[in-house]
Amino acid sequence: MNRPSQISQDVAQPLSNQHETAMMSSDEDSMSRDSGICELMDENTPVCFSSMSTESTTVQVEECMEIDEDENLQPGPVSRRQKKVTFRREKSSCQVRLFDESPTSHKMFMRPQAPLSVRSENQQLLQQRKRKFEKSEQSSDHFHLEPMSVEAMDDDEIVMMDQNTTKWEPGFRAPNHKKGRLTRSATAFPSLETFEEEEHEEQHHLNVKYHLKTVAKESSKGFRRITAETLRDIFFRLSEKEFDDKYILIDCRYPYEYNRGHIKNAINHFDRVTVSKIFYDENGRKRCNKIPIFYCEFSQARGPKMAYALRQVDRELNVNHYPKCDYEEMYVLDLGYRNFFFAANEANITNLCQPHAYCEMHDKEHTMELKKYNFHNKGQSVLRTVSMSRSFKSLPTGSAFNFVASSASFTSAPSTSTENIDTNDDCQKSRTPAVPRIASRRNLFSDPSHSPTNFAQFPLTCSRETPSPHKHPLTCPRFS
């Protein structure tokens, strides 16, 4: 009876010792510093702990059967019964996740952005779940308007949607401003919209029908250019009275050029400020129904500028009736009077120029008179030109010599005498007076004889003078 119990105790004791050893080893492994998991642990490292997991260990225990002494059994191998003993212990499993961001960063607490898969049967439910927010109506001011509700998908639902679903558009959008665009039909039969757009374009632009033959190259939208042959044909086709009733020919050159030779029936006017007096009265009404033709020496500066000045006055008077103009059709003689004169001279036509001569603007005989005008300059000032013309008109007769003398005084050296100032009193009144410059000598030395520039006036008188060098060659007594 005692032997089986001892055997059972001997068997159970090593099993219990084995179990305790296994428990101690497992605890040492989990708390050991050599463990790879615990090496990554740190105080500031964010850790995601999973739920506690349980592990079961099965141990087989052999238990002996108790046999009574009274039972007559044959000796043989002892039959043993196996018993399963289950030990349960809790083991904490830790998972360490390292992040690049700082532990205090706001991204640590953000919702995970991993791609999520959605079942096809749940996609319909996601589409039904929608939230509403406010959106402004489309208008020019899209910041302060009454809100309107627009359905939009949730942010989480957008992530879970597959590629087969429709693309979500933002609720807020800038207003679309419709831009007017001119479209023209490329077919042989344009549409009605094309004609309406062309009529709308004609209302904002002045369309002029020129009846004379013009130069092919269009130089300006305000006027057109005609050749010398075209103007010559007009004189041959119309009489002098018919020409005056239909056209007005304006010579924009200076008076000395006009007097030496100009086209017949032409009037001289070079001031662009007073061009309105020719075509309009004091009340701003149109004087005549004539077609203006402008020209100058080359028709490059003075003639075209006069045409632009007339168009500017016309626009100012008809500002409420834009784009209507009183003088819509205007012409400029191409290449000017110079080309017209030589073309008529080659054709032996002498009755088109009165007198039949030509004077250049830079003629040497009229150099001083050219200084009165500067309308041919690109940077000319109208106010300065008007003031200069008035000052020259106020000069008395016989003051041409005084003007020449005063102009020569600007180029010559300043004079110290006051005789020229007294003789030019009349000229000084008509122009800006020039301050006379009188040269004065600087007395840098108390004694003028000490000045290095006055050696000729005050020769030096010294008792001891430096001996002059010998003019004969030097001789050495050794070689003499």
UniProtKB/Swiss-Prot annotation:
Q: What processes does the entry annotate via GO biological process terms?
A: epidermal cell division; G2/M transition of mitotic cell cycle; nematode male tail tip morphogenesis; positive regulation of G2/M transition of mitotic cell cycle; positive regulation of G2/MI transition of meiotic cell cycle
Enzyme class name: hydrolase
The Rhodanese domain sits at 243-349
Q: Which UniProt keywords apply?
A: Cell cycle, Cell division, Hydrolase, Mitosis, Protein phosphatase
Q: Can you provide one Gene Ontology molecular function annotated for this UniProt record?
A: protein tyrosine phosphatase activity
* E.C. code: 3.1.3.48
| Record GO cellular component, one term | cytoplasm
- Compositional bias annotation for Polar residues: 1-20
- Alphabetical list of Pfam families matching this protein: Rhodanese
Q: Which InterPro entries match?
A: MPI_Phosphatase, Rhodanese-like_dom, Rhodanese-like_dom_sf
Catalytic reactions of this protein? O-phospho-L-tyrosyl-[protein] + H2O = L-tyrosyl-[protein] + phosphate
Q: Where is the region Disordered?
A: 1-35, 411-452
Source species, domain of life: Eukaryota
Which PROSITE patterns did the record assign?
A: RHODANESE_3 (PS50206)
Q: Which CDD domains match?
A: Cdc25 (cd01530)
Recorded phenotype for the gene knockout or disruption = Viable, but 85% of animals are sterile at 20 degrees Celsius. Reduced number of intestinal cells in 1.5-fold stage embryos due to defective intestinal divisions and binuleations at the 16E cell stage of embryonic development. Knockout with wee-1.3 RNAi suppresses the defect in intestinal cell divisions in the cdc-25.2 single mutant. RNAi-mediated knockdown causes abnormal male tail morphology; this phenotype is suppressed by simultaneous RNAi-mediated knockdown of wee-1.3.
Q: What does this protein do?
A: Required for intestinal cell division following the 16E cell stage of embryogenesis. Regulates intestinal cell divisions and binucleations probably by modulating the activity of the cell cycle regulator wee-1.3 and by activating the cdk-1/cyb-1 complex. Plays a role in male tail development, via regulation of the cell divisions of the ray precursor cell lineages, perhaps acting together with cell cycle regulators cyl-1, cdk-1, cyb-3, and cyd-1.
Question: What family name appears in the similarity comment?
Answer: Belongs to the MPI phosphatase family.
Q: What is this protein called?
A: M-phase inducer phosphatase cdc-25.2
Source organism (scientific name):
Caenorhabditis elegans
